[in-house]
Amino acid sequence: MYVSAAEGFFLISGIVLGLVRGRKLLDQPFKKSTKLILKRGLRLYIEACLLTLLFTVIGWMFANNPGLKYGIASPDTPFLAIVWNTLTLSYSYGWADFLRYYAVFLTGAPIVLWLLRRGLWYVVVVISILIWSLYPLTPGGENYIELSWQVIFYAGMIIGFYWPELTNFWRAHFSRRTRIIISRLLFASFITTAIANFILVFGALFWNIEPLKSIHYDSIDFFEKDRMTWRRLLLGTVWFWGFFVFMRRHERLITQKLGKLLTPLGTNSLYVYTIESFVVFFAHLFIAPAQPLVQILPWYINLVISITAIALVWLAVHKRFLFKIIPR
């Protein structure tokens, strides 16, 4: 897909951080917010390092398995070197690699929060864009994603910090009719581009339709994930706010019908992400190779596998499996 759910998670995380640790603690000492943020960042850093080492050791046990995730360190590598590279964040392995990005972003968050407390949001914007523009100067790859993806997280922090002003501006400067029109246009844009994206990707990778394959492979570089191109950012913005409009419009109904199913997953997001990383890791080892499933199994089997994986994660939350060990 030209935009993934990951971008939305980073944006939401930034929004929540800006609102909960920024705006709501505005009358509290800055030291309090900083301590809470850095404590969370340290926790994520420790978990990211431990999971990398654990997945590496487990991966060595399945070295000849075709479903083993790519990028694992060679078993011949001195273990102390792997530990050092893990601690310095130059090596990451497994399906929980986003934790290290969160840890890095949270480390920089107090600086952003300090600027926001002084009304210097535009300084944050300029610095963030400058850092984002540095990515093309690097060798590229996962070790430099922090440079490009931070623009999403810190944009979220700005939005969260100024959420009351933004909502007041929205209601005060746009009539109800105008708000409805804008919301519907956003949702229509989201649906239209999402369907087009689905047809292109699945037409190229699964249905093997030649014209769609040509369009897809000609377009994919414009939406490069690691670089986080401006086109991907723009499309992600449309998708996020289009989906937000839908969720806000039907929030009460969704809560009534799906609240018991979704709320436990949302309130234990770090735990869910950790458990999910193990489910995905072993699913690829014993069910089908990892990259990508849609090219190997029929769509309905993939659907069953996906639903089963989600059910396993939900069951783990429901049973509070290892709640005292795995951070939440």
Residues of each region from the PLM?
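Alpha-helical transmembrane segments and their immediate juxtamembrane cytosolic regions
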Residues: 1-328
